[in-house]
């Protein structure tokens, strides 16, 4: 069981992300599957995210993580984007990211939003 103080710190990091990026949710915990694609998955968040530095907004698919960053996350996120974009062509995902929520911060809540390139070839190479 995860201690409540670790859960609280991760939630506070999530709240800090929400304040910084002001996302507008299109979907949360949406199960993604399409008859033409041989895999499925559940996207944690899809919505409009505005970069606080550039003020540019993009439809972004985000997966929440509490562990380390791994290269395989790019495959997972690209696969989810592939399905989403097939299902919702009027609302194409143009960015994918992992939101890493840590419980180790001391003074103030922190998070890391790690963007990945969407790479459909990388996904196809996993199942071809």
Per-range role (PLM):
Residues 1-40:
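Metal-dependent nuclease catalytic cores that hydrolyze phosphodiester bonds in DNA/RNA
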Residues 4-5, 30-127:
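Nucleic-acid nuclease catalytic cores
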């Amino acid at each position: 069981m995860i201690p409540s103080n670790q859960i609280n710190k991760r939630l506070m990091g999530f709240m800090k992300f929400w304040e910084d990026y002001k996302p507008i949710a299109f979907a949360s915990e949406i199960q993604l599957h399409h008859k033409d694609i041989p895999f499925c998955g559940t996207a944690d968040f899809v919505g409009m995210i505005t970069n606080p530095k550039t003020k540019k907004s993009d439809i972004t698919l985000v997966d929440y993580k509490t562990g380390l960053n791994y290269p395989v996350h790019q495959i997972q996120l690209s696969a989810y984007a592939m399905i989403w974009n097939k299902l919702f062509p009027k609302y194409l995902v143009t960015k994918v990211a992992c939101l890493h929520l840590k419980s180790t911060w001391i003074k103030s809540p922190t998070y890391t939003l790690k963007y990945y390139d969407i790479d459909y070839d990388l996904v196809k190479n996993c199942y071809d």
